[in-house]
Amino acid sequence: MLNAAAADRNKDPILSVLKSRVASNRRLFALEISSGTGQHVVHFAKAFPNITWQPSEVETQSLSSIEAYRQYHRLQNVQPPIYLDVSQSWQTWGGFPAESCDLIININMMHISPLACTTGLFHGVGQILKPQGLLLTYGPYAFNGSIVPQSNFDFDQSLRYRNPEWGLRDASFLTTLGQENGLRLEEIVDMPANNKCLLFRKDSVV
């Protein structure tokens, strides 16, 4: 099993956001896109036994780690991880029908992937999220062209140096991208270490 220190640090703050906004008294289906090591999905699944959780990844090593966490924790409400390339058409995302997911989570992906992954994420989520369903994204973001504090600005510069296609995405751009795909930015939640949770609600009509 892989272990990411950042996942250990942020899993409880993100869980707190979920607990105050996601129902715990009815059956739901949640897709985590870019599940990483698998630490998040098992943590959330323990807190929400009413939700069937579907982890996904594009990296083979991560898929193996997710399955190892799933087996270790013996959680009946976590499905085996699936391969999902978010830059590809949503029809390739494991065969999910349109409007089949109550909740979709995407943690720390957008700033370390090409822009095509971000646009693909919003396009696909707009298709497979149920009306009034919730998309939660987490990470560092720019706001109206500005990146603060300095540590986030430096982080963005280091990412772009490593890969020109990486970098912090602007929340205003994501708001527009969401609107184009029937997703309304409902809330921005301040998180530790200068991160944010962006909560998008799918409107009834796309």
UniProtKB/Swiss-Prot annotation:
Pfam families assigned: DUF938
Matching InterPro entries: DUF938, SAM-dependent_MTases_sf
Membrane spanning stretches: none
Origin: domain of life: Eukaryota
Similarity comment: Belongs to the UPF0585 family.
Cross-referenced PANTHER family: METHYLTRANSFERASE-LIKE 26, UPF0585 PROTEIN CG18661
Protein name according to UniProt: Methyltransferase-like 26
Gene: mettl26
